[in-house]
Amino acid sequence: MSVRRAIVAALLLILPAAAQGGFLAIEEGARATGMGGAFTAVADDATAVFWNPAGLAFMDGFKLTGMGTRLFSVDDLSENVVSLTYSGWEKTGIGAGWARTGVDEVYDENTFVLSAGREVFRDGLSVGGTFRIYRLAAPGYEYYNDPNFNDGAQDYAFDLGFLYRARTWSAALAVRNLGQPEMSLISTTEDGDPVSSEVRVGGAYVFREVMLISGELRIPKEVPGYYTRSVRYALGTEIWFVGAFALRAGINDGKATAGLGLRISWLTVDASLLSVRRPGTKYRLSLSLDF
């Protein structure tokens, strides 16, 4: 059996877990993931469209980020992210993004997002929303000629975010996947596999303009047979040296993360890794442009 067919077989064995967990497991941006994913109260770059759209209200100009990931040293398995934001109006920003996890011509999970954020009521307080389109496909399964196989599945969800940003600290609340989408690639399945809704509460503090400390709690909606209401956490820190080089570290629900960044004028390069005893380590690389 070829490597690709073996991957298809493995994915089909864990398909419910893949559909539920894959869309939740991907975390966007090497900067954010180097900080343990504690980014809900930070949300100050183009990946805010995924983390907390309320952050769009505080940005300026165009921001573009692209990310590639090598997953667990498996050559055919990867994550890709692209996001673009624009804030050219007073107190308002918009953005769009795409995230993919999969194996070429075998299995794909795609997420498309459209976001907007605006400062409201008082200076420093913003609200934002993100419309999500989830698409699931396993073209490699056509090899098995299963009459019950669907070519793909699609559903929709909505995120709502709030952010209060003071001079040295910020606090945030985000609700993800409102509407709790369900998808299935097997036509005989009565109920699709859910992508759980989740509440995230976070805070961040900036020390002497060079050190950022952030943390958050994540509370998924309980779905019998799929998700328990188990609270997860993320902690992270970022330190900048002469405004050009950054070191990052974090903890994501007990798993250690680390990262670094290099900024040259309008270009920033970020790298991160997530250490998992099994199945291995995730390596992420991001390029970001501010213009």
Language-model regions: role of each:
Residues 20-291:
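Subset of outer-membrane beta-barrel
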Residues 1-29:
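Cleavable N-terminal export/targeting peptides
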